[in-house]
Amino acid sequence: MCDLNKTGQGQVECFMWHEGQGRRGSNEIGSCLLKYLEYKASAQENVEVVFYSDNCAGQQKNKFILAGYFYALSKYNIKSITHKYLIRGHTQNEGDNVHSVIEKHVKRALKSGPIYTPDQYVSLVQTAKKTGLPYKVQEMSYADFVDLKKLSEQTSFNFKKDSSGEVVKLANAAIIRIEKENLDKFLYKTSYSEPEYRVVEIKQRTTRTNQTFDNVKLEPAYRDILPISKKKYDGLMFLLRMNTIKKCYSPFYNSLKVSNDVD
């Protein structure tokens, strides 16, 4: 996350985890967004948040991320959330610049020797920026990730058509906006040149088991650390035996959980 203000780039927050702690899907991305939103709401009242991101529909342009936004607006002191998806191949955001700075710093470090553990990457990210505010790192564990798919089910969060009767295709959205005062709907555009927002009403089925965003409790996405494949684990153990990975780093690798599934 990269804060932008009138003077340019502000504080950068980097959320990091390895594959034994989480995957790279909507639950993980959404959990990071919720942590960020909770922090922003605690630091400033009635904040209006605008996110800029790439167009990765699988991770951040779907109804599970939207459900997370509705939850945040219901729970936190946030006035509105707007998410703008940048046009593929035509835009570059501040996040791209941050990634470039980190990548160059890592490449320089690799000239001095190997990087053996995720902790070393954390240190490199924290020291990558040489001027201004250093990058902050939030290290995520499996216990930090919430199940946004479950949240969507618990609240019967659903929608099909906009107010004009057109089927809503989030994959085509360029801008999505949700307002605290109107949590029964969200607004979206399919292009930046579109003059008016399209309105989408949220359809929630009423049953005895339904919960609202006000009273729902977030469920954990994982109950334990995630296993890595046996093939990958065996490869790492081989590198340890050959001393390609130094023995002093063995506690981290020995702590990894291995899958019983056959590759």
Question: In which residue ranges do the predicted regions lie?
Answer:
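Extended mixed-charge, aromatic/glycine-enriched low-complexity segments
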Residues: 1-263
